[in-house]
Curated annotation (Swiss-Prot):
InterPro entries per UniProt: Metal_Hydrolase, TatD-like, TatD-type_Hydrolase
Annotated a divalent metal cation 1 binding sites: 112, 222
Entry protein name: Deoxyribonuclease TATDN1
Originating gene: tatdn1
GO molecular function: 3'-5'-DNA exonuclease activity; deoxyribonuclease I activity; metal ion binding
Origin: domain of life: Eukaryota
UniProt keyword list: Hydrolase, Metal-binding, Nuclease, Nucleus
Keyword Plastid applies: no
Length: 298
């Protein structure tokens, strides 16, 4: 049995890839149970399943009832915020709030919400700004921390966070890939910073990650996305490998499909760059995460 303890703060377990479906086509049999088992074997004790919009938040919540280790978030991703307008913003917000406050044993955060100016083709900037701000209503009403997203929108993100910081108990900016100055601004707001494969692509990314105090770090996979690729600066620091096939085979990972078990690889890169003991770092991160999302739960 492993000595490591992990909470994967961002895992997209509602994604069809974990059921063998890629781009709408069934490519292999449903291996969801195997994916979860591999994660448990490396020490993942809790999985926080990301809600990307109202429908996805409902699906994530439904999934949480299948295992005691599963929890979820409720919110609307910046690229999907046009749904507020499409369905009526008051009604949409009310539905998100109902889902949040009526499932307090399983919903641990408001999100995924924030700003994504890299993908404005999915949702205009003005719409993203309006409905990121609105989702602080959810955080304030529920008393839950926030699971936050920021891509190429640091200035606007920080501005909204500063104006609304007192309305939420705390939060984590997940999949962080910003500069050292960006990280410092988030730390000044007493936010946590989530690290996954997308946070470890370049030498600069590694230096930024190294600069973040360990008591402000969290860890995630964002699977099936954001895996550590061979071209990433951190890849050479990975010690743990998993049997992987290009074509699916039972008992194996699938090439290019990130899994929650790969959280151990994220830790290995982080610990090597920071020159810290992996077990000590994992324990610090586990406690950070437990404090934000689970400490005050009944």
């Amino acid at each position: 049995m492993t000595n490591f303890r992990f909470i994967d703060i961002g895992i997209n377990l509602t994604d069809p890839m974990f059921r063998g479906v890629y781009r709408g086509t069934q490519k292999h049999e449903d291996d969801f149970a195997e994916v979860v088992e591999r994660a448990l074997q490396v020490g993942v004790q809790k999985f926080i399943i990301t809600g990307g919009n109202l429908e996805d938040s409902r699906a994530a919540l439904t999934l949480t009832h299948t295992r005691e280790q599963f929890f979820s978030t409720v919110g609307c991703h910046p690229t999907r915020c046009s749904e507020f307008d499409d369905q009526g913003s008051d009604q949409y917000l009310s539905s998100l709030l109902d889902l949040t406050v009526s499932n307090t044993q399983k919903v641990v955060a408001v999100g995924e919400c924030g700003l994504d100016f890299d993908r404005l083709e999915f949702c205009p900037k003005e719409t993203q700004l309006r409905y990121f701000q609105l989702q602080f209503d959810l955080a304030e009403a529920s008393g839950l921390p926030m699971f936050l997203h920021c891509r190429n929108a640091h200035t606007e993100f920080i501005d909204i966070m500063r104006r609304n910081r007192q309305r939420c108990v705390g939060g984590v900016v997940h999949s962080f890939d910003g500069s050292q100055q960006d990280a410092a601004a988030l730390l000044d707001l007493d936010l946590y910073i989530g690290i996954n494969g997308c946070s470890l692509k370049t030498a600069e990314n590694l230096e930024v990650m190294k600069s973040i105090p360990s008591d402000r770090l969290m860890i995630e996979t964002d699977a099936p996305w954001c895996g550590i690729k061979n071209t990433h600066a951190g890849a050479k620091l990975i010690k743990t490998s998993f049997p992987t096939k290009k074509k699916w085979e039972t008992g194996h990972c699938v090439k290019d499909r990130n899994e929650p078990c790969h959280i151990i690889q994220v830790l290995e890169v982080m610990a090597a760059v920071r020159e810290e003991d992996p077990l000590d770092l994992a324990e610090t991160i586990f406690n950070n995460t437990d404090t934000l999302f689970f400490k005050n739960r009944s």
